[in-house]
């Protein structure tokens, strides 16, 4: 029987405004954001906190004080927060990190893997040591985090895991220097899909966010947002089509919306995937890319 007594089709399918708002709320949830010191990681942590979650944050660099500043911003919202140093490529560090968060928060409802390491060398010129460093953080680290946190979520029969992949993980790059990044990000995309299969029966959703161009703290996106198709003016030599396609300066010209994404726009996607608003979404690579992959 589809309807309960006194219910009609209209009042079943039309939620109230309060119900819609509550679906996006993270009030009472406990989140762990990995790689939250700056840029997108910081934005994700603050976004989850604004939606109501208590947020633990971690980074390999804690000495600069930036991570503690993010934690202070979260606490200023009347949320709980702790800032912890961890090398997620090290299994012992990951175990200690998760244990500390659970001791402080009681559980982990949301895991966001955002940590990233770049290397300027082309994939064809990369040496074995550099490749190992890249994969240890960008791939092994994500795997270690999921392996350590998922048993907690299995025990409580709920959870949301969100990985950061990229447009680079979804199509090959003309720019050789992006090759190693693309290979690793494609691995994260498949890791997301595989864990969706394994953890779905335990009511744990596993998704990924795939941005295209996103503002940096050094290059804010607000002006770009207001002025479509405007780029930084500076002298430059004539570029090839491949360089034009991949360049930070001209890249927005190849995005239908004509601009880079702001941190707030990225955070909105994270809140959606972490919340009950996406309760039937798992195994998805969410392109937050201004139409780049269209």
Question: Where in this protein do the model-derived segments appear?
Answer:
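Residue(s) in the substrate-gating loop at a strand-loop-helix junction
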Residues: 166
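Short C-terminal tail/terminal secondary-structure segment
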Residues: 3-22, 259, 270-271, 282-294
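Short, small/polar-rich loop/turn modules that mediate ligand/substrate recognition or access, typified
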Residues: 200, 205, 281-283
């Amino acid at each position: 029987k589809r309807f309960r007594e006194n219910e009609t089709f209209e009042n079943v399918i039309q939620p109230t405004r309060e119900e819609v708002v509550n679906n996006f709320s993270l009030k009472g949830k406990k989140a762990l954001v990995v790689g939250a010191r700056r840029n997108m990681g910081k934005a994700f942590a603050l976004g989850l906190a604004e939606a109501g979650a208590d947020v633990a944050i971690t980074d390999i660099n804690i000495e600069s004080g930036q991570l503690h500043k993010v934690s202070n911003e979260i606490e200023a919202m009347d949320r709980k927060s702790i800032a912890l140093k961890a090398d997620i490529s090290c299994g012992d560090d990951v175990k200690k990190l998760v244990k500390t968060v659970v001791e402080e928060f009681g559980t982990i409802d949301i895991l966001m893997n955002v940590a990233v390491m770049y290397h300027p060398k082309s994939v064809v010129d990369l040496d074995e040591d550099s490749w190992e460093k890249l994969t240890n953080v960008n791939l092994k680290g994500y795997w270690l985090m999921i392996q350590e946190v998922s048993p907690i979520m299995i025990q409580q029969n709920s959870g949301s895991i969100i990985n950061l992949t990229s447009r680079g993980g979804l199509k090959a790059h003309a720019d050789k220097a992006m090759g190693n990044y693309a290979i690793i990000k494609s691995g994260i995309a498949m890791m997301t899909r595989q864990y969706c299969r394994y953890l779905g029966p335990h009511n744990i959703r596993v998704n990924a966010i795939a941005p295209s161009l996103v503002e940096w703290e050094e290059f804010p996106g607000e002006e770009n947002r207001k002025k479509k198709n405007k780029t930084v003016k500076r002298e430059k030599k004539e570029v090839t089509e491949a360089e034009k396609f991949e360049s930070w300066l001209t890249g927005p010209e190849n995005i239908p919306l004509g601009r880079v994404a702001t941190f707030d726009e990225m955070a909105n996607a994270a809140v959606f995937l972490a919340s009950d608003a996406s309760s039937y979404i798992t195994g998805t690579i969410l392109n937050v890319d201004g139409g780049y992959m269209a």
